[in-house]
Regions:
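Short acidic capping loops at alpha-helix termini that bridge into adjacent secondary structure
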Residues: 87-92
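Cofactor-centric catalytic regions
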Residues: 1-84, 96-188
Length: 188
């Protein structure tokens, strides 16, 4: 772990609570976790997204990523609301299909959020630029395509500091245990 990661910051965030509990003589437990995002380790890892302005004057989101309960539709709608001047009511998420939606590779919640989310963000940039000075009616039938390829190094790469995954998330949790009952008293 180097200084580009957020692990130290998560530890520093719980430190005041830890110090207080120790000062009070309370038993304390700390757990740290790290989660990678993406397929990684040099395996091809891409996300693709297509935005189409359809006859209803709404942007329809298409991505060939399997949604198996991880909430990809919600993520792509949020990405579109955040990265365009559109309101939620102007956006339609279309479930994945092989007829029109571009392939977005393997599926997992963190992978699709990062990789296909970035592809969606890129498509949103193109859409927003095209919308400048125009109306949704002017853009009916236009398609805006975004793609993101997460470049990583294979396992055993002969290079200093190989990149196994494009992103990581870090967390630290601390619990204070009740001395008498042995049960968790509080969780930070």
């Amino acid at each position: 772990v180097n200084n580009s990661t957020g692990l130290v910051e998560t530890l520093e965030a719980v430190k005041p609570y830890y110090d207080e509990a120790v000062k009070n003589g309370d038993p304390v437990g700390i757990a740290c976790a790290m989660k990678n995002a993406g397929v990684g380790v040099g395996i091809p890892d891409w996300g693709r997204c297509k935005l189409i302005v359809e006859e209803d004057r709404k942007v329809h989101i298409y991505s060939g990523a399997s949604c198996i309960g991880q909430g990809l539709g919600t993520v792509l709608v949020q990405m579109t609301v955040t990265n365009t001047p559109l309101r939620r009511e102007q956006i339609v998420y279309e479930r994945s299909n092989t007829w029109i939606a571009p392939d977005s590779g393997d599926t997992s919640g963190s992978r699709q959020t990062l990789i296909t989310g970035e592809a969606c963000r890129r498509a949103c940039e193109l859409f927003t630029a095209a919308l400048e000075g125009k109306t949704m009616h002017d853009l009916i039938g236009r398609e805006f395509y975004g793609e993101y390829y997460a470049k990583t190094d294979p396992l055993g790469a002969n290079k200093p500091n190989p990149v196994s995954h494009v992103a990581y998330g870090y967390a630290t949790q601390m619990c204070v245990v009740d001395k008498k009952t042995g049960k968790v008293e509080s969780l930070v």
